[in-house]
Design a protein with these regions (language model features):
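Short S/T/G/P-rich N-terminal loop/turn motif that feeds into the first structured element of a domain
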Residues: 1-214
């Protein structure tokens, strides 16, 4: 399974109008071709005026076929023309699920706030980090944080990266859960081994778009 992670930054003040216009019709057109998104978010803390949406596919071939059909749809073409000029930047990356995720029986919602965490791993160290996390990190982290919305590794785009998303009720819930995790000796032992393997860590807090119900 792969996920197309798409990040669009709008001109200041235009994102609410984009969401309203998109929800009124184009969302139905897009989901008719691509299926339901795995996430459709608005950045709350991070790169503001940005929407992040994630679409799942069986493989690259399925993604191409579905997107080709969507791009040929007259309703979608009309929407693209109406929406031209809304965004100042658009980027996407293709990622694949890590071998140990999804986990059967793991909580899957509901959530109102998502911690969107992108880590860049030192060159050549990604397999080592994933193995270490699977054996020593996943247990304490999932015990304390609970709702893992997704856990992916880079495929097309930026390389040597992992993306993991954690759902929370709100900011207070996030602070409480992360505080408990960071105080756990098992997590502290994992972090001591993992930090030398990491090159860069970024996080954004995102909320669900008005029309997206996880």
């Amino acid at each position: 399974m792969i996920v197309d992670v798409r990040s669009y930054t709008a001109h200041p003040g235009l994102l609410p109008k984009y969401f309203a216009d998109y929800a009124a019709g184009p969302f139905a057109v897009q989901t008719r071709h691509l299926g339901q998104p795995r996430g459709y978010y608005m950045v709350d803390t991070g790169v503001v005026n940005t929407t992040i949406h994630m679409w799942g596919y069986k493989d690259i071939a399925e993604r191409q076929a579905k997107r080709d059909a969507m791009q040929a749809d007259p309703e979608w073409k009309a929407w693209l023309a109406r929406n031209a000029g809304t965004f100042v930047a658009q980027e996407n990356r293709i990622m694949k699920a890590v071998p140990f995720w999804p986990v059967a029986g793991h909580p899957s919602g509901p959530y109102g706030l998502v911690d969107f965490r992108l880590y860049t791993v030192r060159h050549g160290k990604l397999p080592e980090l994933l193995k270490l996390y699977e054996t020593e990190g996943w247990g304490p982290q999932s015990k304390h944080l609970g709702n893992c919305v997704g856990y992916y590794q880079s495929d097309v785009g930026g390389q040597n990266q992992i993306l993991h998303l954690w759902g929370y009720k709100d900011a207070a819930d996030r602070s409480m859960r992360r505080g408990a995790m960071q105080a756990d000796p098992a997590w502290q032992a994992y972090i001591a081994k993992a930090m030398p393997l990491l090159q860069r860590m970024e996080t954004q807090l995102v909320v669900n778009a008005p029309f997206f119900k996880p």
